[in-house]
């Protein structure tokens, strides 16, 4: 198995959220995305179908039931993180069309520079408020097999997403 690339060690400031993001190797052979000092996502570049966090595994299991095994799907991801589920879908359902929406302009480009997606991943990135983008996409006639909502909703989240 080839060695996984090592992130540059740099951080990026997320201008909308006002916090820093960084990617670091972890003790499990993957990488974690930290935003504002809190771990948000885990990625295993050597095995994108391996999902470390239980809540993401549960989401992946739901996505597994959307269509027959291996069949491509159209998925809207509200919240980008380290793009763990888009990577999973490319590994398990090659040819899937995916759209990711995130409020922080810098996040997706940073994640892609540090942890490139698997070859052939069809991913469109939209910088917008997830709620507004979902409405706009629906009004534009876009249809998806599944919508994944993975946005922080605690005190650090956007005001309209809190509790």
Regions found by a protein language model. Give the residues of each.
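Rossmann-like AdoMet
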Residues: 1-69, 91
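The AdoMet/dcAdoMet-binding core of the Class I SAM-like
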Residues: 27, 46-163
